[in-house]
Amino acid sequence: MGGLVVLLVGLLTALMSVVSYYVSPKGNNTSTWQMSLILTFSCCYLLWAITYLAQLHPLEAPSRVLE
């Protein structure tokens, strides 16, 4: 289920990027708006995915110390 969540959120991010490409304000700096929004969505997705996957598959297993 963990990998599926990452894939679904990635598809949602791609959809939001495509929508932002067409909905961005028109004018002299349209391409700046488009790239800024797409980069924002992709960076937020990467930050979330790396954090989520690091918690899903930790490098060191948690250990319990009994006294």
From Swiss-Prot:
Q: Which GO terms describe its molecular function?
A: ATP hydrolysis activity; proton-transporting ATPase activity, rotational mechanism
Residues on Lumenal side: 1-2, 57-67
* Domain of life according to the entry: Eukaryota
What UniProt keywords apply to this chain's record, in alphabetical order?
Answer: Hydrogen ion transport, Ion transport, Membrane, Transmembrane, Transmembrane helix, Transport, Vacuole
Where is the protein found, in the record's own terms? Vacuole membrane
Give the residue spans that cross the bilayer.
3-23, 36-56
According to its UniProt entry, one GO biological process term is: vacuolar acidification
- Grouped into one coarse class, the protein's main location is membrane
Residues exposed to the Cytoplasmic side: 24-35
Gene Ontology cellular-component terms for this entry are: fungal-type vacuole membrane; vacuolar proton-transporting V-type ATPase, V0 domain
Membrane topology label:
Multi-pass membrane protein
Q: Tell me the function of this protein.
A: Subunit of the V0 complex of vacuolar(H+)-ATPase (V-ATPase), a multisubunit enzyme composed of a peripheral complex (V1) that hydrolyzes ATP and a membrane integral complex (V0) that translocates protons. V-ATPase is responsible for acidifying and maintaining the pH of intracellular compartments.
How does this polypeptide assemble, per the annotation? V-ATPase is a heteromultimeric enzyme composed of a peripheral catalytic V1 complex (components A to H) attached to an integral membrane V0 proton pore complex (components: a, c, c', c'', d, e, f and VOA1).
Q: Which family, according to the similarity comment? A: Belongs to the V-ATPase e1/e2 subunit family.
Q: What is this protein called?
A: V-type proton ATPase subunit e
- The organism encoding this protein is Schizosaccharomyces pombe (strain 972 / ATCC 24843) (Fission yeast)
Q: What is the lineage of its organism?
A: Eukaryota, Fungi, Dikarya, Ascomycota, Taphrinomycotina
Which gene does this sequence derive from? vma9
